[in-house]
Every structure is written in structure tokens, then in C-alpha cells.
Amino acid sequence: MNIKKTINNILKVGWSLLLGGAILYWMYRGFDFQQVKDVLLHKMNWTWMLLSFPFGILAQTFRGWRWKQTLDPIGEHPRSSVSVNSIFMSYALSLLVPRIGEFARCGVLKRWDGISFPKSLGTVVTERIIDSLLVLLIAGCVFLLQIPVFLNFFDKTGTSMESILHQFTATGYIVTTICGIAILILLHFLLKKLSIYNKVKATLQGLWQGVASLKGVRNVPLFIGFTLGIWLCYFLHYFLTFQCFEATSHLSVMCGLVTFIIGSIAVVVPTPNGAGPWHFAVKTMLILYGISSNDALFFVLIVHSIQTLLVILLGIYAWISLSFTDKKMRKI
């Protein structure tokens, strides 16, 4: 059984790496990577990139504080520092194995603060539901406001959805189909995991307590503030990078929101930090807003790479910090 599970895990990781790598290869085939060095050293405004870093750190910090708040009503009280470091670790570990971070952060709380694993996992489910609903709400509002932009684009270029589909290359159809299949596979595994948890009474109770914990949140305005703060910081972490490049510095906040939302949806596809699907989705939307294909390729490659490096550094910091953190008595 363990061997079968190990093989399945290896296949999942291999599949995610293959998918992300295939999309990146298709996007950057024939791309002159020698120009990236020139852009990084001479054409990129590093001041704006550095200014975006605090917002990336704050987004994860707010997530850690919010998580602690959802655990308090169910009798679990992790330390704020451990909660935040668990978030830093979870994002870094998800670069190695997609989605593993959600389980890893629960493991960190159990190991250092004796927090019940099933209960903490239940609150993770709660958080995901809330974040998904918020993203969908923002997406709906943004796209309704941007309908004139899309119509104007089609009018100026003399195109329609029908003509776009006709111009869609065979490779484009393949990539889109692969992304769709990947989402279905992810849903399959999530449902399969859920069915396994349902067979374990203690875990089911923990999950339910985690979901129900939202009702007992003592400071609802603070919880809402953390939630909005998380996504505002994520957006600023992304949007400020527009100012790093001359080609994107003129783009509006609304354009930033559209590309940000599309990118956030694209990372649902299980690849390390959304590598591949995120590049494809954001690059496509930037082209829609008038950015050349080459400039869009530079933007998504550099921004994603640097922000991924930040995630790695935060993970290393968390690992070092936890190494010097005393462990509380564990709960069974």
C-alpha cells in the first residue's frame, strides 16, 4: 500500500512538472534568453520590484494571523510567530510538491504548538472557501466593468470571438485542453481525498469544527480586514511590478486587476507556483491590453521568477526561525 501511495505521489509530482514545463517550453521556444540579462541589468526599474516585496510578505503574514484567529474559537491557540512561519513554509514547500503546503502548515502547528491536525485542516478548508468566493466576486465585478474594453478591442481589430477561435492554433487548443484536464484531475483527487477523510470519524469531526469555527470568530471586522488585506497585498505585490518595465508602466489599475484575477484562477492548475498556466494566462491578457508578445513574455518570466525566489527566501527564513523556536507539548 505504501509503495502504491509513493508511486502515485511521484506520478502527481511528475505530472505537475511535466505540465508546467511543457507550457513554458511552448511559450518560450525560440525565445532569446540572452536578452533577459540585459533587461535585468539595464532596462528594469528595480526600485519598484523592491517596493513590491513588503506586500508579498504582508500577504502571507496576514494569512498567518487570520489562520490563528479561525483556530481560537475551537480551542486551539497557536503562537502568532509559528502560525506565520507555517504559512511561509507552506508556500515554499508547494514549489516542490503542488498543494502539499496546505498539509505541511497543519503539520508545523502540530509539531511546534501541539495543535490538532484535523481541526487545523478544517480551518484551511474554511479559508479556501472564503478566498475562492472573494476572488469570484472580484472577478465578476471587474469583468463587468471591463466589458467595454473587450468590445473596443474587438471593434478596433475587426475581430470577433468566432474569428479568434478560427485563429487559435492547434498548439493553443492543446494547451487549453491540457489545463482543463489538469483542473478535472485536481478535482478528482480532492474528491477522493474527501471520501477518505469521511471514513475517519475523528478527522471528519475536526474538519467540521474547522469550518464551523468561523461562526465563533470573536472579532469579525478584524477577520474581514485580514481577508481583504491578504488580497490587497497580493494585488499590490503584483501590480507594482508593472512599473518595473517601460512597456507595462502605463497600464491602469483595472488592467492590473483583470490580469491579476486571471492569473489567480490559472494557478488552480497544479504546477509549482502556477508556473506555466500563470505565464500563459497573464501573457495572453497583457497582449489583449496592447502589450507586444515579446514584452509580455519578458514580464511574466521575470516577475514570476523573482516572486518565486522571494517565496523560497521566506521559506528558508521560516525554517531557520522554527529551528530556534521551542516546541510546546503535543496533543494526540
Please annotate each region the language model reported:
Residues 1-88, 145, 150-267, 306-332:
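Predominantly cytoplasmic-facing regulatory/coupling regions of multi-pass membrane proteins
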Residues 92-97, 121-144, 298-313:
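Membrane-embedded alpha-helical segments of transport systems
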Residues 69-74, 95, 106-113, 285-288:
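Helix-loop junctions at the membrane interface of multi-pass solute transporters
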Residues 80-83, 100-102, 115-129, 292-302:
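Membrane-interface alpha-helices at helix entry/exit sites of multi-pass transporters
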Residues 89-98, 258-279:
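Transmembrane alpha-helix interface/packing and boundary motifs in multi-pass membrane proteins
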Residues 84-111:
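Hydrophobic, aromatic-rich membrane-embedded alpha-helical segments
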Residues 109-116, 210, 280-298:
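Interfacial segments of multi-pass membrane proteins
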